[in-house]
Amino acid sequence: MAQILPIRFQEHLQLQNLGINPANIGFSTLTMESDKFICIREKVGEQAQVVIIDMNDPSNPIRRPISADSAIMNPASKVIALKAGKTLQIFNIEMKSKMKAHTMTDDVTFWKWISLNTVALVTDNAVYHWSMEGESQPVKMFDRHSSLAGCQIINYRTDAKQKWLLLTGISAQQNRVVGAMQLYSVDRKVSQPIEGHAASFAQFKMEGNAEESTLFCFAVRGQAGGKLHIIEVGTPPTGNQPFPKKAVDVFFPPEAQNDFPVAMQISEKHDVVFLITKYGYIHLYDLETGTCIYMNRISGETIFVTAPHEATAGIIGVNRKGQVLSVCVEEENIIPYITNVLQNPDLALRMAVRNNLAGAEELFARKFNALFAQGNYSEAAKVAANAPKGILRTPDTIRRFQSVPAQPGQTSPLLQYFGILLDQGQLNKYESLELCRPVLQQGRKQLLEKWLKEDKLECSEELGDLVKSVDPTLALSVYLRANVPNKVIQCFAETGQVQKIVLYAKKVGYTPDWIFLLRNVMRISPDQGQQFAQMLVQDEEPLADITQIVDVFMEYNLIQQCTAFLLDALKNNRPSEGPLQTRLLEMNLMHAPQVADAILGNQMFTHYDRAHIAQLCEKAGLLQRALEHFTDLYDIKRAVVHTHLLNPEWLVNYFGSLSVEDSLECLRAMLSANIRQNLQIWVQVASKYHEQLSTQSLIELFESFKSFEGLFYFLGSIVNFSQDPDVHFKYIQAACKTGQIKEVERICRESNCYDPERVKNFLKEAKLTDQLPLIIVCDRFDFVHDLVLYLYRNSLQKYIEIYVQKVNPSRLPVVIGGLLDVDCSEDVIKNLILVVRGQFSTDELVAEVEKRNRLKLLLPWLEARIHEGCEEPATHNALAKIYIDSNNNPERFLRENPYYDSRVVGKYCEKRDPHLACVAYERGQCDLELINVCNENSLFKSLSRYLVRRKDPELWGSVLLESNPYRRPLIDQVVQTALSETQDPEEVSVTVKAFMTADLPNELIELLEKIVLDNSVFSEHRNLQNLLILTAIKADRTRVMEYINRLDNYDAPDIANIAISNELFEEAFAIFRKFDVNTSAVQVLIEHIGNLDRAYEFAERCNEPAVWSQLAKAQLQKGMVKEAIDSYIKADDPSSYMEVVQAANTSGNWEELVKYLQMARKKARESYVETELIFALAKTNRLAELEEFINGPNNAHIQQVGDRCYDEKMYDAAKLLYNNVSNFGRLASTLVHLGEYQAAVDGARKANSTRTWKEVCFACVDGKEFRLAQMCGLHIVVHADELEELINYYQDRGYFEELITMLEAALGLERAHMGMFTELAILYSKFKPQKMREHLELFWSRVNIPKVLRAAEQAHLWAELVFLYDKYEEYDNAIITMMNHPTDAWKEGQFKDIITKVANVELYYKAIQFYLEFKPLLLNDLLMVLSPRLAHTRAVNYFSKVKQLPLVKPYLRSVQNHNNKSVNESLNNLFITEEDYQALRTSIDAYDNFDNISLAQRLEKHELIEFRRIAAYLFKGNNRWKQSVELCKKDSLYKDAMQYASESKDTELAEELLQWFLQEEKRECFGACLFTCYDLLRPDVVLETAWRHNIMDFAMPYFIQVMKEYLTKVDKLDASESLRKEEEQATETQPIVYGQPQLMLTAGPSVAVPPQAPFGYGYTAPPYGQPQPGFGYSM
């Protein structure tokens, strides 16, 4: 039996299977902060990636393109911390957002999450904690101790409260790995250096201590051996006993001399220390005692990272092969292991108690029994209470304590036991009962309540029953905790807490008999019963049938409570609740009509029987409700006429629910019944629904009853809103007939809907006493003329006066016109005008009179109004017209009168006198009218004076338009007359601007010359001089130079710039020269005229530095570098030194540049100037001056100049410069170009730069200095990034031997890396294939196998390719290669070893084909190896197809135990072919999975009898008995025939065989067959057959046996019958006892049958002479 293990070991996944490159599985690239995530940094092609593996979904790794030096996942969430250089960032992957970032001043060499929100950062000097919460920066915790200097930091740990911090590092010393730790106390701020390799903190609570102790565990492998230390850090908490220090040896096997601890985790659940070593060993130690529990090797590779495994309270880690492994305590096995294997029962007991582990039951029972036997009951009680899994907390233990009598004055052992259990936790069900029974008997109920509150008792139904007799409320609490629903609900009902019943029942999913409960509650309290009933139906699905609940209410005649219940229960108004709604309304209509009225009024229900309820409402006197429910018109008309019993407002609304026809019928019925009583309601209904009922129908209905009063009130209610003209007309008619004249006036005044003509004619015909309505209609609709005629002809002149005085005085002009038309006297008209003073339009009155040529009629009235001080324009207009027509000094009136309208009067004068029109228009500033009059009458002088005085730019713009045909004469008058007369500058300014705006430059010049040059008051005006020159620039450039020379008071710089912009460069030059602006003048010569010779002459004449500078700049731009430099020197201007240097560089004027830069250096000690001066000296080959300059004080960038000299191949100068700045790298490059190779190598050694080594190396290769090249190359190849370029350089030049020599020499370097081994292997494959195999066998683990694979394949090195595929675990490719190139690559042992590891099973069949073709004699060996994974059916089909089955017979025999049909049939065919009948019979008996019938049919025709015998055997096996027997008879196999007939159990077949024996005269066979088929043969048939054939002697033994059996049966039957009779007699005398259990007989009594001889196949043949079973009845 295998030994039990105390640990459970599990491999969770293989990182390489997830596509992780093995090279990236290491301490520097893989991190695991917890068992949730693994984070790996990879480089795929040129892209850096971070792979995050979620351990809950490892098959879907997350890949992110992130370039970082390190990445660590948060222990719990998808938050990642990234480090790139000194920059730290924290990202939330799910939110895709950056949480925090910080840049450190020092490099972070190690970092780790120490909690869910804190990262520890370790630099070379200190340790920091960085919280990801808020905006906090990293906080320094402590400085690193000197003992950790030079160590590789491998871990950082803290205790639970982060009060103790531990930094761990390792270093190589004296050929061993030494561990160094720094333990730091946050509170004391002190550090202690400790030698150790792995450590962890733990919280441990010792027995008897109140608080947990903080333990520090660390392991060390020193020169003397390994030790595990467990100590308590800090001062023990108050009241705690200090934890005793532990120091135990850590065993390391002899073969692991260099092994040391690398990781430690402590299981908080089991208090076990997990220690892992470098060589993959795991050690388990008990935390409390330090005892070693278990040690074994779990990994052949180093486990370099670990974390706690929360799911199992164990440890999880990753080794270098990429296996993710976990180890945890096997709870079922650890205690038995400690007990049986370690033989440490004390530790087993201690761990079992401490961690509640099973496996120590026997130890605890033994200890308990021993203490109990000694009378040490208190200790026994402790053992029983502390035993894990409650193994001793049994009723038997309680009975044992109960059996012990209590000592006087002492607590009984039972109570001691219960006391210990209560201190530790909760009692179980039996313990709770046994404790509470005596407590309740003593009346100490408060103890029970206390224990229940503290959850010390396990509640049960039995405990509740026990408590209920004392306190039902307390019992309720027990029942609730015990979850006994029926008892809980019973207690709720008994204690009156019915509101909790439903809630509790729903909560626990219990369904009691709700109706029974309701009856009980209703009997006790109807109010509580109502409340309970409402709770039953408050959900969507009622708990009980509402009808049954209502029946319960009605049983107790609780109408009010039932109503309240139903109102609440039926509030959702469901269709299915219709009968209940009817029942609710019915009971209230019969017993409380007011309640029913309120319910109906709230419109809560809609699904009750409306017809039935309507009848009940009418009987109850609720006519309104009855009408709401009536649907028949007869019923409605019967009720609706009683309007005095109905609410009028409701009745009006009710009509809205009736159809139009029904409404009209009801209205007719109301008027017919009592028109006086019902008229008001009728009118209200008609008013509200006139749109639906049609106003015309209602009007006709009123008129049919001759009710004009009703019609008036009805139409009065709608006329204000109606747009129907007929309604308004009918309303006017009704108002007239009812004498409502004021209403007629109002509607005539306010309505806009009636037909005015129709109403006017009606009012004329009506002959009303008051004509005001008619006046209003005529006034509103402009029938004034008709009105005047009607009133004048009917002698109603007083209404004319009333009209113009009171109704509408503004209509006076129309009335006057009408009166003039009827030849009314002038006196009457004048009097009427005087009566209506100022309340009408004078213009209209003048127009009416003027139309009739009676204007003079108004002269006295007009003069009187002016005399009164009237300022109305119309009055003055009329008077002006009269004065103009009468020629009564009109011009004076027009100039002096300020009140008339200039446009009106001017228009009146245009044809009569244009001059007067101009006067009128000018007075009113009527510009357009004035212009038109002047243009039409050629009054241009007047117009020009008016325009100048007007000073309106817009007006000027309108007359100066090119489209104006009168523009030229107007301009002539402006220049000659208007401007000459003016002295106002503003008038001149506006006029000039107008000409400018109109774009009339020539006219403007003419105008300005008149003003400026003709010695006017405006001659020296600066703006006008500027304008004159600018206009000339624009219009006539020939005059510009003249104006420049004649005028002096203009803005020279602005004018000059404008001249330049208009390409008048000479004029601009003249202006600048005239005003001595020389810099601008020379600029014009340079930039615009472009004549540098004139500029040079001008500069010599001026001799100003600024002018020389401008000239120099221009010369420089034109490429005249030498002249430019001379000009800059004359200007003494070094400001443009950069442009000068650039130009000199381009043109090569180095000598001149030296002069310029020497001048510039005197003016400014610029670094650029001195740098360029050095380069210029180098270019002019003044090396002595250069060396003197650079050795003296200077600010030049010598390195930069050296690089330029180097680039331009001035290597001598570059040598001086690089030497000066000690740039050995560039010096070495320079020396290479000078051919000084040895000196170049020395310089490269001083520079120690990869780039320099590479450059010198390449130069040495080109110079064939291979020894020096190799010296350089050895410094390059250790850098993996540079290796490829170096190899390509050698290869491109064909120096393969030298390259291989260099790489072979480099393999021994300390910094030799994978790329070197890989590239050397590739070179071997190309140039020295004979050395390839040896190299791979030595260094296969250090080469990049995929890369070498490609090289080996390209070089056709098939054996080496197979070797690499095998090492790279690409077994499929290895097999394919061996099969494709068997001559070079195939080796039998290697092939069979690899083929079993392939992933693609298809290769098995290709391998079989390969062996069949190349190695047929070894095929069976291969098949034996492949058989575990081979599909045998497919293999057999293949061999059958190629007809090679005999070749693989050994394979077929070896796999036949699988009972495969194809294998069986193939082997059987081989046996038949080989005529091996014995092997065939053995195969058939052992393996039955083949086509039996097909094989039998094939064999029955075989020429060998043994094979035909097997055919009969097969027919027998398939129940083809007759065919089998016939075949035996044919081949004279008599024994087989008798045996098969016997086995068939077929009587007919056996008798046929007997007959055949007799026919063939085989009497001996007949006798043998009688006994062989004894059970099948019928004695009568045998007797008859023997008698007929006279062979009674052969049959006699058979008959003797038959007689013997039958006599035995009869004797047994007789004995059985006698026994039965005796039992019957005994039964008759026995009294009937009802208490005895009754038997259920499954069948009646039957005749006993003696036992028969056994038959095969579970079937018993009936005895001869007994009835055979029929189809359900006995025959």
UniProtKB/Swiss-Prot annotation:
Q: Which PROSITE patterns match?
A: CHCR
Residue ranges of region WD40-like repeat 2?
Answer: 68-107
Question: Where is the stretch described as Proximal segment?
Answer: 639-1675
Question: What positions are modified (N6-succinyllysine)?
Answer: K737, K1441
Where are the residues of the annotated region Globular terminal domain?
2-479
Q: Which SUPFAM superfamilies match?
A: ARM repeat, Clathrin heavy-chain terminal domain
Q: Which family does it belong to?
A: Belongs to the clathrin heavy chain family.
Protein name according to UniProt: Clathrin heavy chain 1
Which species? Rattus norvegicus (Rat)
